[in-house]
């Protein structure tokens, strides 16, 4: 996603590093393409769990192991998957893992989550706010300015983290996701997208093989490209999907049902 490009481009310019972008593999096997690019010249790999345009899946356990073998670091933005697809941090072993709270986390805008590996939990934060300083919980002593930070990853918190509007929404979303179960969400959505993919293939809309994409994500491509006005026509039918790159991105959730799928397919038949 662009957010995971711009920040690294800026950092590379500051420190004289080179950004290497892996082009879309012809076979759409991103894992093999990433593994082939890893060598001793790599310092950091900034990756998702699945691609934001079509759901192309990456084997993060294999990639993480390959990076550690050459002394490189793994930074993950899993906004496109967290909340809908399981990830085992103990096996992947990312150095940093970030995710926005909205999208599959079902939370509000303006919040995000950050995991920091133990070896980086004593680093210097990007934001110099007061609440991340040592002893900030003692309001009576705030006049005694502190140079040290809160222990561990707490030092990386944003300012105004005690947001009385956003935090309750985020907590409610997390509780709902845990109640449903992430593995069950993935299994249910994988069945739903497989059904959509099968019905759309006869319309000339081609999905990635199920083995190469995340179960909750479907990107449909068409030879010759998607027709102009596609989204506007679907919107007029009350159907909300998006185009990302050359893919018609279809990402249903648990609230979508068979009738929604039938409505989508019927509308696509009229357009295509």
Name what the model sees in each region.
Residues 1-272:
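Pyridoxal 5′-phosphate
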């Amino acid at each position: 996603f662009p957010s995971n490009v711009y920040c690294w481009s800026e950092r590379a310019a500051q420190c004289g590093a080179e950004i290497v972008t892996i082009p879309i593999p012809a076979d759409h096997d991103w894992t093999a393409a990433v593994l082939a690019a890893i060598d001793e010249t790599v310092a950091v790999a900034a990756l998702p769990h699945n691609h934001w345009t079509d759901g192309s899946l990456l084997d993060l356990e294999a990639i993480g192991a390959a990076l550690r073998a050459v002394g490189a670091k793994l930074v993950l933005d899993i906004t496109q998957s967290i909340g809908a697809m399981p990830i085992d941090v103990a096996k992947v072993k990312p150095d940093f893992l970030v995710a926005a709270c909205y999208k599959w986390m079902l939370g509000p805008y303006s919040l995000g989550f950050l995991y920091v590996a133990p070896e980086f939990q004593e680093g210097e934060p990007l934001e110099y706010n007061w609440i991340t300083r040592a002893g900030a919980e003692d309001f009576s002593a705030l006049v005694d300015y502190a140079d040290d930070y809160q222990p561990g990853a707490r030092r990386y918190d944003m300012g105004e983290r005690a947001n009385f509007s956003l935090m309750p929404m985020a907590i409610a979303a997390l509780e709902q996701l845990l109640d449903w179960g992430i593995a069950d969400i993935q299994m249910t959505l994988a069945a739903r997208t497989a059904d959509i993919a099968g019905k759309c293939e006869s319309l000339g809309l081609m999905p990635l093989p199920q083995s190469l994409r995340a179960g909750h994500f479907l990107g449909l491509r068409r030879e010759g490209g998607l027709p102009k006005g596609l989204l506007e026509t679907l919107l007029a039918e009350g159907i909300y999907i998006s185009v990302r790159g050359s893919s018609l991105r279809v990402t249903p959730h648990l609230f979508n049902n068979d009738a929604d799928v039938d409505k989508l397919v019927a509308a696509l038949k009229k357009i295509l």
